[in-house]
Curated annotation (Swiss-Prot):
Gene3D superfamilies given in the database record: 1.20.1280.290
Record topology, Extracellular segments: 16-24, 80-90, 140-146, 202-203
Bilayer topology annotation: Multi-pass membrane protein
Species whose genome carries this gene: Oryza sativa subsp. japonica (Rice)
Signal peptide: 1-15
Chain segments annotated as transmembrane: 25-45, 57-79, 91-111, 119-139, 147-167, 181-201, 204-224
Entry protein name: Bidirectional sugar transporter SWEET2a
Role summary: Mediates both low-affinity uptake and efflux of sugar across the plasma membrane.
Length: 243
C-alpha cells in the first residue's frame, strides 16, 4: 500500500519503535485475518456441494473478491511497487481461492445463474488484463504505483459493498441462513486490523476503504445476532460449521 503522498509504506519509517511495532503488528494481523477470510466460505461451499444447489447464495462477493485480489496482486509485484512482496503473496493465494469458489458456484448453479456468473468471470479477467496493459503502457513506475493504488482503493470499497445484497436478504427474510458467519466475522476483523494499520501510518489509501469495511462488518454482525433466532441454525452454537 501507499500513503497519501504516493510513497510505499514499506519504505517509510514512523520513528518511534513502539509505534512501528504497533503498525507492523496491525499489518501482520490483517494478513492473518485475510487468510482466514479466504477460507471462511468453505462451509458454505461444502453445503452447496452436498445439496447440489447454490440455493439463494450469491456469487457476487467472490467475484468482487477475485477482482480485488488480482488488482492488489498486481500492485504488490515489482512492476508496480517495491518492498511489498507479502501483498502479492497473500493476494495470489486469495485469487486462487476466489477462482475455486466461483468455479464451484458455476458448477452447481442453475442455467441462468451459470451464464450470468460465467460472464462476470470473463469480465473480471478482461478488466484485469486492461489494467495491466494500461498501467504498463501509459505510466512510468511512480505514476503506475499511484494509478494502481487508487484502483486498489476503489476495488476494496466495491468488495466491502458487495455484502449489501446479502444484508437486504437477511432483513427481508429475517434469517441469517444465507449470510455465513465466518465470512462476516473474518471481514470485520481484517477490516479493523487494516484500518488500525492505516490510521497508525496516517495512510488515506488504507484506512478509508477499511473503515468502510469495518462499518459494514459491524452491521452484519449486529444483524446476525438479531436475526439468528429465526434461522435454521438457531439451535447450533455461533461458531459451528455445517456437517
Amino acid at each position: 500500500m501507499m500513503n497519501a503522498l504516493g510513497l510505499s509504506v514499506a519504505a517509510t519509517s514512523t520513528g518511534s519503535p513502539f509505534h512501528d511495532v504497533c503498525c507492523y503488528g496491525a499489518g501482520i494481523a490483517g494478513n492473518i485475518f485475510a487468510l482466514v477470510l479466504f477460507i471462511s466460505p468453505l462451509p458454505t461451499f461444502k453445503r452447496i456441494v452436498r445439496n447440489g444447489s447454490t440455493e439463494q447464495f450469491s456469487a457476487m462477493p467472490y467475484i468482487y473478491s477475485l477482482l480485488n485480489c488480482l488488482i492488489c496482486l498486481w500492485y504488490g509485484l515489482p512492476f508496480v511497487s517495491y518492498g511489498v512482496v507479502l501483498v502479492a503473496t497473500v493476494n495470489s493465494i486469495g485469487a486462487l481461492f476466489q477462482l475455486a469458489y466461483t468455479a464451484t458456484f458455476i458448477a452447481f448453479a442453475d442455467a441462468k445463474n451459470r451464464v450470468k456468473v460465467s460472464s462476470l468471470l470473463v469480465m473480471v479477467f478482461g478488466v484485469f488484463a486492461l489494467i495491466v496493459y494500461v498501467s504498463l503502457a501509459l505510466f512510468d513506475h511512480q505514476t503506475r504505483q499511484l494509478f494502481v493504488g487508487y484502483l486498489s482503493v476503489a476495488s476494496l470499497i466495491f468488495m466491502f459493498a458487495s455484502p449489501l445484497s446479502i444484508i437486504n436478504l437477511v432483513i427481508r427474510t429475517k434469517s441469517v441462513e444465507y449470510m455465513p458467519f465466518y465470512l462476516s466475522l473474518s471481514m470485520f476483523l481484517m477490516s479493523v486490523s487494516f484500518f488500525a494499520y492505516g490510521v497508525l501510518l496516517h495512510d488515506f489509501f488504507i484506512y478509508i476503504p477499511n473503515g468502510i469495511g469495518t462499518v459494514l462488518g459491524v452491521i452484519q454482525l449486529v444483524l446476525y445476532g438479531y436475526f439468528r433466532k429465526g434461522s435454521r441454525e438457531d439451535s447450533l452454537p455461533l461458531l459451528v460449521t455445517h456437517t
